[in-house]
Amino acid sequence: MSGELIKEEDIIIRNYRTSDYQATFQILKELQSKYNIGFVESKWRETSGLRQFKPNLKRITLIAELKSTGQVVSLGMLEAVKSNLGQYIGYLNNWATEKEFIGKGVGKILADRATQILKSWGCEAVRINMAYRGDKKLIDIFGKVGFEPIITVLEKKFETD
């Protein structure tokens, strides 16, 4: 595939299906090896049901697939959470794109659809959680579409048996 952008009409954005497990696993496994994102296959498998659409929850996993081949090329999880101040905040989590499609606009197409959905759910803002030592390039990319850093989150990991 050459360096040109993928057109929106060449992509299908849809809900995650159980048949997407292997394709999404491969995308995340590659990210894990490159960026150590905390991906653990057994936990991904155990939480498969969380990626399924549930009408009573404001949480879904979106899939971007090529219309021509059906190849899954990107995924992203979105969720609306009511804050303790009473406002809904949308979150984009576990955003990942197949290596050969990075920089071709697929992630933006997927994120645009996700933000439309979050807005329709009544969200007043959308947040993206990134690693503190995240790639400066990603911050610049998100900045081009209106995202800016607003908070710092501190985390303490618990030891597991």
Identify the function of each model-found stretch:
Residues 66, 98, 102, 131:
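Residue-level recognition of the GNAT/N-acetyltransferase active site
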Residues 89, 125-127:
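Structural preference for beta-strand elements that scaffold enzyme active sites
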Residues 11, 18, 29-87, 93:
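Acetyl-CoA-dependent GNAT
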Residues 24-28:
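Hydrophobic pocket/interface hotspot
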Residues 142-152:
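Conserved acetyl-CoA-binding loop of GNAT-fold acetyltransferases
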Residues 127-138:
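Conserved beta-strand-loop-alpha-helix junction that forms the acyl-donor binding cleft
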